[in-house]
């Protein structure tokens, strides 16, 4: 699980973004994304991929996209 956040007090911005890869019951891989304001419930989206390699590539793309938008990695979950 990868945790990202973006905090900008001047713009009253406190956002989080979580990315996670999980296997499905049907042998596919799911990229789970959750985002929202820190301290509030967020929104979720799940994208399913036929192979782990494709899911990892999508995760890397999303991570680059978030880092370009000034999100900072705050830690990896267990």
Which ranges hold each PLM region?
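Disulfide-stabilized extracellular ectodomains of secreted/luminal proteins, especially beta-rich
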Residues: 1, 49, 54, 77-78
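Short, mixed-charge low-complexity intrinsically disordered segments
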Residues: 65-78
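Negatively charged, low-complexity tracts enriched in Asp/Glu with abundant Ser/Thr
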Residues: 1-12
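Short aromatic-glycine-(Arg/Gly/Cys) micro-motifs in beta-strand/loop hairpins
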Residues: 18-45, 60-61
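Solvent-exposed, flexible loop/coil residues
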Residues: 8, 30, 42, 53, ...
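Charged, amphipathic alpha-helical segments
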Residues: 12-18
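A short, charged, amphipathic alpha-helix used as a generic interaction element across diverse proteins
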Residues: 41, 49-68
């Amino acid at each position: 699980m990868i945790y990202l956040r973006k905090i900008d007090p001047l713009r009253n911005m406190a956002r989080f973004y979580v990315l996670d890869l999980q296997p499905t019951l049907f042998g596919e891989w799911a990229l789970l994304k959750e985002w929202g304001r820190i301290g509030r419930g967020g929104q979720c989206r799940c994208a399913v991929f036929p192979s782990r390699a494709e899911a990892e590539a999508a995760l890397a793309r999303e991570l680059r996209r978030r880092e370009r938008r000034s999100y900072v990695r705050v830690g990896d979950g267990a």
